[in-house]
Amino acid sequence: MSRLQFQLQATDGHARRGRLTFPRGTVETPAFMPVGTYGSVKGILPEQIRALGAEIILGNTFHLYLRPGLEVIGDHGGLHGFARWDGPILTDSGGFQVFSLAHRRKITEQGVTFSSPTDGARVFLGPEESMKIQKVLDSDIVMIFDECTPYPATEDVARRSMELSLRWAQRSRDAHDGLGNDAALFGIVQGGVHPDLRSRSLDGLQGIGFDGYAIGGLAVGEPEHERNAMLEHLHPRLPAERPRYLMGVGRPEDLVEGVARGVDMFDCVMPTRNARNGHYFTSFGTVRIRNAKYERDLDTIEPGCGCHACSSGYTRAYLRHLDRCNEMLAPMLGTLHNLCYYEKLMADMRAAIASGTFVEFRRSFYAARGATTPPLPGETS
């Protein structure tokens, strides 16, 4: 039995305020999880991540299995000791990374055989292998092994993919339990943009029984309105007493719209990857620091921001200079800023839900960007 506890503390519309409790710590929800693909959130230290307000991070099963390998991580007692992060960690199953190797993999009932992107060797990964890897990683939330349905996909392709994922979900559950792993195990709802397939996937997963439910296959190129429609379809069907995780999404607007539709957890490489490309998130939009208009701009990225980059007075002109010179300080400062922005956004949403003012918060969020607040179901624009 999992040692994860989830407490739903407040709701405002469909938005949910809650708390995840693990032996390694608590996570206030809705939460954003910084991505540490190789056991490190690129460019910053674990203690800096914690200081920004992050309480849980994500590790990548697929990449850590290939490099450095389970023996090295096992020597450290698991991923926490290896990465020097003492809070909860969620590990994905490797399914999405296998999905991204479209031309180098073969899917069968047993699992997936693919060419390693590191050395070209043939590697097999299935539900049992994924559960064994995540047991060695000793993550606090384990994800089932699934097939990520591509977009676009015909209903027949999406159905066959969803049914395969359900069979793999049962095998993941059996393997996880057989290993005596008391980490939380999350199911992943698939089915593309077909509501009936999403319902069937969720029904099947609930029949197996999981500690939380992720919504997969919604960061693969589908239009925003189709993603939101799937979240709206699933919200009343997902068990209220279990956490909900929207995988791989995304922009600040996506987080706000996901929370408005009942999502509790998010992850995305966007704040860190975009920082390395000179894109800095702010309450008024994105500062693209490579734009010539910032060459002599003496403002910080966002005046009043409490991140190290802004509170220390580093100007946009200076950051543009660092970026143009390929100085490593530029992505470090940008990453600190972007993650600070994301974590503050989540904290502000938690406070708004708790106080019953999420509608006003959402309206203010878009107004600061000079944008019209998109209507929710049942509202008129």
From Swiss-Prot:
GO terms for cellular component: cytosol. One of its GO terms (molecular function) is metal ion binding. Disulfide bonds: none annotated. Residues 248-254, 272-276 are annotated as: RNA binding. Binds 1 zinc ion per subunit. Zn(2+) binds at residues 305, 307, 310, 337. GO terms for biological process: queuosine biosynthetic process; tRNA wobble guanine modification; tRNA-guanine transglycosylation. The active site is at residues 92, 267. It comes from the Bacteria. Pfam families: TGT (PF01702). Its cofactor is Zn(2+). Pathway: tRNA modification; tRNA-queuosine biosynthesis. Substrate binds at residues 92-96, 146, 190, 217. Its EC number is 2.4.2.29. It catalyses: 7-aminomethyl-7-carbaguanine + guanosine(34) in tRNA = 7-aminomethyl-7-carbaguanosine(34) in tRNA + guanine. It is an enzyme of class 2 (transferase). SUPFAM superfamilies: tRNA-guanine transglycosylase (SSF51713). Keywords: Glycosyltransferase, Metal-binding, Queuosine biosynthesis, Transferase, tRNA processing, Zinc. InterPro entries: ArchSynthase1/Queuine_TRR, TGT, TGT-like_sf, tRNA_ribo_trans-like. Homodimer. Within each dimer, one monomer is responsible for RNA recognition and catalysis, while the other monomer binds to the replacement base PreQ1. Belongs to the queuine tRNA-ribosyltransferase family. Catalyzes the base-exchange of a guanine (G) residue with the queuine precursor 7-aminomethyl-7-deazaguanine (PreQ1) at position 34 (anticodon wobble position) in tRNAs with GU(N) anticodons (tRNA-Asp, -Asn, -His and -Tyr). Catalysis occurs through a double-displacement mechanism. The nucleophile active site attacks the C1' of nucleotide 34 to detach the guanine base from the RNA, forming a covalent enzyme-RNA intermediate. The proton acceptor active site deprotonates the incoming PreQ1, allowing a nucleophilic attack on the C1' of the ribose to form the product. This is Queuine tRNA-ribosyltransferase. It comes from Xanthomonas euvesicatoria pv. vesicatoria (strain 85-10). The lineage of its organism: Bacteria, Pseudomonadati, Pseudomonadota, Gammaproteobacteria, Lysobacterales.
